[in-house]
UniProtKB/Swiss-Prot annotation:
Pathway(s) where this gene product acts: tRNA modification; N(7)-methylguanine-tRNA biosynthesis
Keyword annotations from UniProtKB, A to Z: Cytoplasm, Developmental protein, Differentiation, Nucleus, Oogenesis, Repeat, Spermatogenesis, tRNA processing, WD repeat
Role summary: Required for the Mettl1-dependent formation of N(7)-methylguanine at position 46 (m7G46) in tRNA. In the Mettl1-wuho methyltransferase complex, it is required to stabilize and induce conformational changes of the catalytic subunit. Required for binding of nanos mRNA and repression of translation by the mei-P26-bgcn-bam-sxl complex. May cooperate with mei-P26 and nanos to derepress the BMP signaling pathway. May cooperate with mei-P26 to suppress expression of a subset of microRNAs. May cooperate with mei-P26 to regulate bam expression levels in germline cells during gametogenesis.
Any GO BP: tRNA (guanine-N7)-methylation
Keyword Manganese attached: no
Miscellaneous comment as given in the Swiss-Prot or TrEMBL entry: Wuho means 'no progeny' in Chinese.
Residues in the signal sequence: none
Similarity-based family: Belongs to the WD repeat TRM82 family.
Protein name: tRNA (guanine-N(7)-)-methyltransferase non-catalytic subunit wuho
KW Cell membrane (keyword) present: no
Main location: nucleus
Compartment list: Nucleus; Cytoplasm
Per-repeat ranges for WD: 70-110, 114-153, 157-196, 200-239, 300-340
Length: 397
């Protein structure tokens, strides 16, 4: 799985077992993180009671390779703490949460903690004291970033996979979205108490972002809509129709205040990305409008786009081409491929991942399978009537 995001001035790109921290302005690599093939060599402890021999077998061994197990370590999520002092990442294969101390040249590993299940999203607390990890069964755990030996704390649970998680700046609410169309606002630390729901989406909610300076958030969904909510009341403030289902969302604040650029990645559409400028009506605290919108082709169809990062002038798009990681840059202004970024530099970056295959995620499984029981019943009833009529005709003859 590939992940990319922009935390000024760094562009962070993670894939396979590597994370690169890039400066897109001077085309330098700040630092990198490379995980070992077997995380037990850096402190991962196998959970007590684990009975699967393959889980205990070192990933780098010949036996594991020959068996073709799915225990190859690969990075799933990467996140910077708000104070920029910590880096957290989660892995698949050997499921773990790794916490690093961010330093100018090298990141120092602080802890490696086993995860019970594969992670789906990751978010730091606003004060950087802890990190939230959600898994594919819908559970959300809190891991302490100060007391590194403290056990994880189960905070809340969904009945389906959680795709994104936010922690409000005042740390009073944790906001989650899932495959079952829901956006849930949970009180913190009393997470047994649900404050509100933001309901209205008809398909999975793939991404959330807080609109700074307000009590509002924006969401993107597989139902082809972009929506703005008051998360305290659960009231919908804006609904904008998209040309295709949205599977990724990024947000960037603009000047003047309370103007934001929202970017979404579309699923299986001729245009890969959509850019939308959100503006709050000066006469009202609840009225949002789409002031500007633009579609970016990004050569959709010629390669498999998996994620992107949004900067002031550019869109960095990562994906797979012939099972190799590919990175391309487009202008935010016109959607054309950027000519200011040397192709050689992009090739140099992706060459660092040359030993890692890049297989795109199958996003079709995000959509819920719907069954029309009435149609099936009517079809069976029709066949019974036809069979009965045939039997009557045979008896008469």
């Amino acid at each position: 799985m590939t992940t990319i995001f922009y935390a000024e001035p760094e562009l962070v790109l993670g894939h396979g077992r590597k994370v690169l921290f890039l400066n897109p302005n001077d085309l330098q690599i700040f630092k990198d993180i490379e995980l070992p093939a077997d995380l037990t060599t850096c402190g991962l402890k196998i959970a007590a009671g684990e009975t699967n021999e393959e889980q205990q077998q070192p990933v780098g061994s010949e036996k594991a390779a020959a068996a073709g197990t799915n225990l190859e370590v690969s990075i799933v999520n990467v996140s910077y703490s708000p104070d920029r002092q910590l880096i957290a990442l989660t892995t698949a294969g050997q499921k773990a949460l790794l916490l690093y101390k961010s330093r100018p040249e090298h990141a120092k590993l602080l802890s490696v903690r086993a995860l019970a299940r594969a992670s789906s999203s990751l978010a730091f607390a606003p004060d950087s004291s802890s990190v939230l990890v959600t898994d594919k069964t819908g559970d959300c755990y809190r891991y302490d970033c100060v007391e590194l030996e403290a056990p994880p704390q189960l905070l809340l649970g969904h009945l389906s996979i959680v795709y994104d998680i936010l922690w409000t700046p005042d740390q009073k609410y944790i906001i989650t979205c899932d495959r079952d169309d829901k956006i849930r606002v949970t009180n913190y630390p009393a997470t047994y108490d649900i404050h509100s729901y933001c309901l209205g989406h008809k398909e999975f909610v793939s991404g959330l972002a807080l609109l700074t300076g307000t009590e509002h958030l924006v969401s993107a969904s597989g139902d082809k809509t972009l929506r703005v909510w008051n998360y305290l009341s659960g009231k919908q403030l804006l609904q904008h129709e998209l040309p295709a289902p949205a599977v990724r969302l990024q947000l960037r604040q603009l000047l003047p205040a309370k103007r934001f650029q929202v970017a979404v990645l579309f699923y299986d559409h001729v245009e890969a990305l959509g850019l939308y400028e959100l503006a709050l009506d000066e006469q009202s605290n609840d009225a949002w409008t789409i002031a500007r919108q633009q579609l970016v082709r990004a050569e959709a169809g010629s390669w498999n786009i998996s994620c992107f990062a949004l900067t002031a002038d550019s869109i960095y798009v990562a994906g797979a081409l012939d099972e190799r990681l590919t990175l391309r840059v487009y202008n935010s202004s016109d959607g054309e491929q950027a000519k200011t970024v040397p192709t050689g530099w992009l090739d140099m970056v992706t060459e660092r991942f040359a030993d890692q295959t890049c297989v795109p995620e199958d996003l079709s499984v995000w959509f819920k399978k719907r069954y029309d029981n009435v149609s099936d019943y009517m079809e069976r009833k029709k066949r019974r009537i036809e069979d009965h009529q045939q039997q009557q005709q045979q008896q008469k003859s």
